[in-house]
Amino acid sequence: MADPGKGRGRSLALLQALKKSQMMDSPSQSESQSPESTPEQSTAPSTIASATPSTSGVSIGGRGRAAALMLAKMQQKPGSTTPAIFVPPSSTSAPTAGTGRGFKLLQNLQASQKASSQIASSQVTSSAQSDIKDLTEKMSETSVSAQASSVAKNKYFREVKDTPPVVKKGETGVPIEVTCNYIYLNFKENIVFEYEVKFEPDQDYKHLRFKLLNEHIEHFKEKTFDGTTLYVPHELPDAVRNLVSTNPYDQSKVNVSIIFRRTRRLSEMIHIYNVMFKCIMKDLKLIRFGRQHYNEHAAIQIPQHKLEVWPGYVTAVDEYEGGLMLTLDSTHRVLRTQTVLSLIKEVVQTEGANWKRKMTDILIGASVMTTYNKKLFRVDTIDDKMSPRSTFEKTEKGETVQISFIDYYKKNYGIEIMDWDQPLLISRDTKRMPGSDTPTDFMICLIPELCQLTGLTDDQRSNFRLMKDVATYTRITPNQRHAAFKKYIESVMKNETAKSRLAGWGLSIAPETVNLTARTLPPETLYFGDNVRVPGKPNAEWNSEVTKHSVMQAVDIMRWVLLFTQRDKQVAMDFLSTLKRNCRPMGIMVSDAELVPLANDRTDTYVLALKKCITSSVQLVVAICSTKRDDRYAAIKKVCCADNPVPSQVINARTLMNTNKIRSITQKILLQLNCKLGGTLWSISIPFKSAMIVGIDSYHDPSRRNRSVCSFVASYNQSMTLWYSKVIFQEKGQEIVDGLKCCLVDALTHYLRSNGQLPDRIIIYRDGVGDGQLKLLQQYEIPQMKICFTILGSNYQPTLTYVVVQKRINTRIFLKSRDGYDNPNPGTVVDHCITRRDWYDFLIVSQKVTQGTVTPTHYVVVYDDSGITPDQCQRLTYKMCHLYYNWPGTVRVPAPCQYAHKLSYLVGQCVHAQPSDVLVDKLFFL
């Protein structure tokens, strides 16, 4: 156990300074408060654990997080919600044991107070208050741990605010009538009863507590129980407050006491709703995989590919601007009809002695479903030294016995394992056992004969015919998706168990989805080279225009290298001639390349040739590869991005062999090359004269489990067409904000160097942040980012708008049409009713979808001191979706976010190193 007298003590130092000022403010106050002056103890749960003074004379140390959180609480007026009692250190105790920055500041504060001890009492009071203010300001400039901002809360309820919902509505655009995948939930009574459950003798094992309480299930038909706290929709009679249960393991008697604590508003209990709908899914006989539930009885067979598709639903309940709603979306899971064992046998026949290496590539990291209980497991390794004949320890009737996998499955599931010599699949998991503070590692052994693979392999994904057949059932139209919602609502209403479960909590589900009014923003005009102006189209695409007109800013390709193997020589020559033939209409000049034929297509052959031919005068390297190989691609990118920095393009020779498409493919490659060399393709009207727009996204490196790659991309010209990029490597447990601050300072410095002035306005689009991190971002990361401004000048204070981008959402929006429902056009905005209750947020459909159902993107404005209106924020966001140069149309997220995604993926998947500073002002990662 850690010494309680150790720690950094920043927050505790601040607390002690505050307490001292309070004593000075009321010198006549007795050391022990009178009962009248003590705030009334609240029945609300405490968010701060109580502390007791050390009797040994050592003052309380620690990191001081709880003390930091107490600062605001101590200043509350009597009668407000109070924390648990905090007992301060004895006045005779030794100095604080912290060693942090806050403690050093406190020491300086005490020294200054001692030197000025002769000052009048009134001056002392004001001086202490001033010192606290200075101390607070200094501490706000330090990198306080993000954990200090987190407060432990009961997972079953949340704070209910009496404030009205945050309403930020725009007006620009054409109103349209839409429906969405939200369903109103209505409740008769807004009360839940909370009870504490005690066991005598006490039971440490949480699972046993559930069993003991469930012996009296007739009294708790509708309940939520976490092992200690019981929530029920009605008050329990006195007769069921004291019960007796029987321990199923030793037949001993256990007294169960149920003690009333308080009533809660039903709107606090969002968790109860979500648990309830999980139970309703069971009532509907659906099988749970993660957060989704699937109907195995409605499985769609695709026999030609040995696949089956399970339809299902994903649900979530929350309180939105328009009230309490259920979010419902249809989903699908692809499974293989063959077992893992049959796949192993196929690989053994084709690969022979190398079967294990091939199966390792296929299985490691894949998810398999056990056929006997329909559970998912991640495969970590294959153990060919184990088989179903192997034994393991199992507890039976209090005794440990050895049992083989063959006997175990026959005894528990009635399954006869046919192949007794098959290897076992190993899945590793970590769980916290009852009564233990440290997690325990588990090794789960799986029988291949009893497992089905889920999902698709890379080979299957590259099979066009297979993917087309699968998409027939998974990419469902808006009409099909809406029909699935209606079917779900009808199933719940017709299922007596589900209906009674809802009625038990006083709930009912609306018979149809939520209808509302959305807006479609006007199309954006595009600007190309030679002052060409192209009006925007409703579908927000300009594929034909991008090759017809000159690019906005062309970079001529004068000195470049073309690598290819001898067998691809003709492909390379055809590509070169097509490139030179089609470059003039785009306004780009292309000179002859330095040709580098290679003897073979080995990875080291490409690497050696690149290192030899790349010199300081080379603008560009293009490598044509015979086949698609990830290791070769990664090696080429590692050389060109980090070791010998130069813009590079890798082309699969097969894509250039189609003579009917070589012209269009070459044109797209030429556009990419222009961007990688620092050119721009098109632009749109930007309303701000001096602004910098930033995109941030992360990628979790699969080869390094504990490391993530975060990319930072920032504009550095007025038209938002030139981009500066940096990469941060984040180790596990490391705070990313320190790296982001460095990136922001570097980007602002580059902006100053390019424009002669700093931007007046900074807009940050941050991807990869979930709902649970919004408060932390708002209270911790954003203040840290604002500190960067003073580094570039004491008077530099630009406005800051911080927008979180969420694209992995379940929201769907459907346009009402003559034929039922369609996807809404790009530019459709929803900013009310189904938006977050307590956040300034909106949804935008920014891209055109020709197959399936479009998914909008959710934007949460977590901070804004610029004063821009909701209309301006929404239109700017939609404008930025037009500037991604890898696609002649709008994309789902703002261009800087998409650029950041491309960069982090390239570095995390291939380069695994910091790209060279030579490339930071170019889109080398496209």
From Swiss-Prot:
Q: Which Pfam families match?
A: PAZ, Piwi
Q: Where is the signal peptide?
A: none
Q: Where is this region: Disordered?
A: 1-62
Q: Where in the cell is it found?
A: Cytoplasm
Coiled-coil annotation reads none
- Which keywords label this protein? Cytoplasm, Developmental protein, Differentiation, Endonuclease, Hydrolase, Magnesium, Meiosis, Metal-binding, Methylation, Nuclease, RNA-binding, RNA-mediated gene silencing, Spermatogenesis
After translation, how is this protein modified? Answer: Arginine methylation is required for the interaction with Tudor domain-containing protein Papi/TDRKH.
GO BP terms: namely: cell differentiation; meiotic cell cycle; secondary piRNA processing; spermatogenesis
Q: Write out the GO cellular component annotations.
A: cytoplasm
Please list the cofactors this protein needs.
Answer: Mg(2+)
- CDD domains recorded: PAZ_piwi_like, Piwi_piwi-like_Euk
Q: Which InterPro entries match?
A: PAZ_dom (IPR003100), PAZ_dom_sf (IPR036085), Piwi (IPR003165), RNaseH-like_sf (IPR012337), RNaseH_sf (IPR036397)
The family note in this entry says: Belongs to the argonaute family. Piwi subfamily.
Oligomer status and interactors: Interacts (when symmetrically methylated) with Papi/TDRKH. Interacts with Vasa.
Protein known as: Piwi-like protein Ago3
Organism name: Bombyx mori
- Lineage of this protein's species? Eukaryota, Metazoa, Ecdysozoa, Arthropoda, Hexapoda
